[in-house]
A protein has these predicted regions:
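PP2C/PPM-type serine/threonine phosphatase catalytic domain
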Residues: 1-129
Length: 129
């Protein structure tokens, strides 16, 4: 069984936390993500919030079937989900504004992993400490 935790807090510059993080686990399957809304742009919290909600909804409806998918196919599913978030945001924000979010997504399943990133957020692998 996988165990972990998530902590996300508002920084010193902004009054609104534009970041979202989550860990969704079921046995030896886990989806972890960090979505970092783009500061200085319109509604970064909306972008990261949409990604977080979309991943949670996906988990609730699809993670059981995804356990059996080849990793390349699963990567395409996640890419389509994130592209859908971007399209939805582009429809909802004012035409002269821009908003977005970075994403680090880690899927762990039975000893295999899939890592997807977009933007300047990072994932580090630590060994022995």
């Amino acid at each position: 069984m996988l165990q972990g935790g998530v902590l996300c807090k508002t920084g010193l510059k902004r009054k609104v936390n534009q970041d979202r993080a989550g860990m969704l686990a079921d046995g030896d399957t886990c989806l972890c993500y960090i979505a970092d809304g783009m500061g200085g742009h319109y509604a970064g919290e909306k972008a990261s919030g949409l990604i977080a909600q979309s991943l949670t909804d996906w988990w609730d409806g699809c993670h059981e079937a995804a356990r059996r998918m080849p990793l390349q196919e699963l990567a395409e599913h996640f890419k389509e989900l994130l592209d859908g978030c971007a399209s939805q945001l582009n429809r909802e924000i004012p035409e002269d504004e821009y908003c977005g979010s970075t994403i680090v997504l880690l899927w762990l399943n039975g000893g295999q992993y899939l890592l997807l990133t977009a933007g300047d957020s990072r994932c580090y692998r630590l060994r022995r400490g």
